[in-house]
Each structure stands twice: as structure tokens, then as C-alpha cells.
Amino acid sequence: MKHLSISAKNPLRVALAGALAFALPATALVAPAVPAAAQSGELDRVVAALRGITTMKANFTQTDRAGRTVRGELTLKQPGKIRFEYEKGTDMLVVSDGKAVSFVDYEVNQVQRWPISNSPLGALLDPKRDVKRYGKLVPTGNPNVLSIEVKDPKKPEYGAITLVMVKNAGAPGGLELASWVALDSQNQRTTVRLSNHRYGVSVADSAFRFRDPRRSSRRPG
């Protein structure tokens, strides 16, 4: 497994990078199996909901295992593009241009990149990632909430992501992505919660570019 070289002096930075790179399933999410027929039908709904998103903006709150929290705005454009714009004072950026996910640290002038397919975010961004094939419905006890753990058993090094979908008639496919959870190889659990979803908004491709801090120390405006 490739280890990220993000500065270890800031545990939050390590957690943010790890959660978006390689992750392992959380044992706390293990639950009794859902009947196959129910699995298939609900997973079809999840796939339709995720694929129904063309563009989306939402506010996010990202919390690591120690309870450290950062906030910002997420911008998504299918296929494959996403941007996590962190709040002022957090000199980091996570962006995918449709091919690779980049973790940009403006504090230490570093950029880490890895293919979308090697990231748990591939469940959201990679059209080749078959959520129905690799997803497993995890019981929640709430008929309005679906929890789906997505991982490729043949490639455990690619990690896993657990998506939490909430029934919402106003969302594509009637399901809204409320949050996701990742647990990295260093046992650092990260939770991302979304709010204030806006669908079908105009998003330029330029939103998924960034100024490389290795060439310039200035953060993009």
C-alpha cells in the first residue's frame, strides 16, 4: 500500500488524506445480512439515485476519529469530478478532474494524486465502479435510511466506503446522499456529512482545476 507523505505534524491533515485515499471497512458496521431480493431492489435504487446526479453542490462537515472537524463546500459534476473547498483557515483542497483525485496541501506545498479507482470516492465518481456488484446493504433499523458498504473483495487495498442515503422525494431517484464513512489503514475513521444539497446547478469545468503549490505558494481564489 502506498503511504501518503502528508506532514505528520498535523494529525487532521493525515486523517483527511487517508480518508480519501485507501480505507478499510469499519468492523462496527458489520450487521446481519439483508435478504438477497431486498438487497437487489434497494441497490438498484441507490445506483439510480447516484447516477441521476448530474451536478450538485452541498455544504459538508468532515470529522475525524478524534472529533476534529472542518467544514466547507462540496461541488460535484458527473462523470468523475468533485471539489472539496475547505473553510477559510484550512489551507487544503481535495479535487478530482475526472481521472485522478488530488490532495493539495498549501501549508507544506505538497500535492498527492491517485487514480479515482483506487479511492473509496470511486463509488461516487467512477462510472466503472459497479455499486450494485460491489455494494452490500447494511441494516439501519430506519425504513427511510439506506446504508451501503461498497468494496471490491478482489482488491481490498482499494478500500471501502459506506454511503448513507436518506429518502427524499426532491432528490434524484428519491434518495439523497446524506453522509459517508471511511476507516483508513491507520484505524483513523472519518465521517463526511452533507447538508443544503443543490441539484442541477451550473458548474464550470474550471472548478476542478487548482494552482499547484509546488510552483506557486498562492492559494487559488
Can you name each region flagged by the protein language model?
Residues 3-26:
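Bacterial N-terminal signal peptides that target proteins for export
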Residues 29-38:
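Sec/Tat signal peptide C-region and signal peptidase I cleavage site
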Residues 37-45:
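Cleaved targeting-peptide boundary
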Residues 48-67:
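A short, Trp-centered hydrophobic/proline-enriched beta-strand micro-motif
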Residues 61-63, 85-87, 104-106, 151-153, ...:
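A generic structural motif
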Residues 71-125, 190:
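An acidic-aromatic
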Residues 133-134, 139-220:
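Gly/Pro-enriched, hydrophobic low-complexity segments
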